[in-house]
Amino acid sequence: MALLHSWGYKTISIELLVKAIQQGAEIPIRPIILTFDDGSETVYTDALPIMQQYGFTGTVYIVYNYIGAGLFMDRDQIRELHAAGWEIGSHSLSHKDLPSRPGKQMDEIDSSRRRLESYLDVPIRSFAYPFGAYDSDSLKFVKFAGYIAAVGLGDISVQSSENIYYLYRQSVTSETTLEAFVQFLPWKP
């Protein structure tokens, strides 16, 4: 986070990115979106305080069935993230590979949004495909369910209206070296 901050990066939400793509909304000079999948409690205990030190916010994609289970955030923690300026998105009901469940995709996509909005009382505007896996039905159901965008995984840093329902992200884990992370960044000092 210190590196991103020192290089002038500013966090934005998926919603702002969509407005910039579709309506020409203004975004900072070096925008970055920091996303976290699944809803691990470490997002609340570790990522939130560190990111707040640098004035950063993130987008967390919640698996509805994981809320409050084991090492996942509970309702209050997720709502605190939202109150701190974080965007909350859906990561499905049960984190299953969607294309391998053709009869369940719509429920995984649509019900997760409706249940999250009802349970958390926060808007759910974007979706993250579990494992980055999708097919033409997944895209159709995400649009039908009322999401404004969806994210997956990939190497392309240029986002456009052509891929609004499969915006690309880089996967960064505890094993990602600083050198590898820097290679993901489009703007360097």
Residue ranges of each PLM-predicted region?
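Acidic/histidine-rich helix-loop elements
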Residues: Y64-Y66, L71-F72, S100-P102
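Short, well-structured secondary-structure segments
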Residues: K10-E15, I33, Q52, F56-G68, ...
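Acidic (Asp/Glu)-rich catalytic clusters
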Residues: L48-F56, M73-S90, K143, S161
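Charged helix-capping and loop-helix junction motifs
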Residues: L71-I78, Q105-I109
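C-terminal active-site subregion of NodB/CE4 polysaccharide deacetylases
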Residues: M1-T35, S40-Y44, H95, P99-P189
